[in-house]
Amino acid sequence: MTFAKGILAALALAAAVGQASATELEHWPAPAARQLNALIEANANKGAYAVFDMDNTSYRYDLEESLLPYLEMKGVLTRDRLDPSLKLIPFKDQAGHKESLFSYYYRLCEIDDMVCYPWVAQVFSGFTLRELKGYVDELMAYGKPIPATYYDGDKLATLDVEPPRVFSGQRELYNKLMENGIEVYVISAAHEELVRMVAADPRYGYNAKPENVIGVTTLLKNRKTGELTTARKQIAEGKYDPKANLDLEVTPYLWTPATWMAGKQAAILTYIDRWKRPILVAGDTPDSDGYMLFNGTAENGVHLWVNRKAKYMEQINGMIKQHSAAQAKAGLPVTADRNWVIVTPEQIQ
């Protein structure tokens, strides 16, 4: 009897400790938290998974768009060290002013997002992962805006670029999902290695598995042997070791699928599952995240939207109507207008 009581006491203590350590969605509006908690309860420990965008979805602001001017400010990323293959158009130098790489990136975006999206991942070529990790950690700790210049037409303009700020709410959600046996994946339009430096580093609290971080991939080169590889290749071959990759150099040569627009949905099919769809997809950009939000989310899953711009909210509402009508016309279950959780950055900061 004493032994049985001891066992029961131990089990009760273990349960209490488990409850005490369980993550709660404290940085969420109450209705959103209830909907997310219900989703987690319904899918706990059943082999389900969730997919998150990173920039402006999992943290506030953009990693590459702030790392670029930060490294320019430090003088370590310059036009002179830019890979020749990335000099796509002439630089727009004016009397007394040499165009910044940040400005150059903006002008590439004016041509087409399909030009600047890969470029802003490729621009970090020539550095080792170890070097970039040091700079990413510096940026995350910087805590103040980074001055940058760009052209508004032919007029030189200035702006302050904010470094990423962790969304407390998303950090909670990542961990609560994983605590309940729901795998968390990141699919980002930023360079996979850069995003991994935040999402998989325990200091930032997301605790994503390194191999579950998926993004724009460029070949990595061993400077001593010339051998080429990528994390995605290593993961597929079952021999991925993030620490062993730290001294590999980032090259500008792109790997596919490219993880923006339809490529995000392609990444789910390529790297996660051909048939099982995520129970939650989170994003903030209609064009880049729209495919995985509408085509990727499971029938009873949640579309999680971070409403950071009024024009994007208007655009996503238009897409909801358009895709709902298209589903109905095709005789498919209408899911595009169901199960949306919409929050602002301020609500989950």
Curated annotation (Swiss-Prot):
Changing K264Q: Loss of activity. Keywords: Disulfide bond, Hydrolase, Magnesium, Metal-binding, Periplasm, Signal, Virulence. Changing G283A: Decrease in activity with phosphorylcholine and pNPP as substrates. Slight decrease in inhibition by tetramethylammonium chloride. Activity is inhibited by high concentrations of phosphorylcholine, phosphorylethanolamine, choline or betaine. Displays different properties depending on the substrate utilized, the pH conditions as well as the presence or absence of metal ions. At pH 5, activity is inhibited by Al(3+) ions. At pH 7.4, the enzyme cannot catalyze the hydrolysis of pNPP, phosphorylethanolamine is a poor substrate in either the presence or absence of divalent cations, and activity measured with phosphorylcholine is independent of divalent cations or is not inhibited by Al(3+) ions. Residues 1-22 form the signal peptide. Mg(2+) binds at D53, D55, D284. Its EC number is 3.1.3.75. The active site is at D53, D55. Belongs to the HAD-like hydrolase superfamily. Folds into three structural domains: the first domain harbors all the residues involved in catalysis, the second domain is characteristic of PchP and is involved in the recognition of the choline moiety of the substrate, the third domain stabilizes the relative position of the other two. Contains two sites for alkylammonium compounds: one catalytic site near the metal ion-phosphoester pocket and one inhibitory site. Sites are adjacent and share residues. Contains a high and a low affinity site for phosphorylcholine. This is Phosphorylcholine phosphatase. It comes from Pseudomonas aeruginosa (strain ATCC 15692 / DSM 22644 / CIP 104116 / JCM 14847 / LMG 12228 / 1C / PRS 101 / PAO1). The lineage of its organism: Bacteria, Pseudomonadati, Pseudomonadota, Gammaproteobacteria, Pseudomonadales.
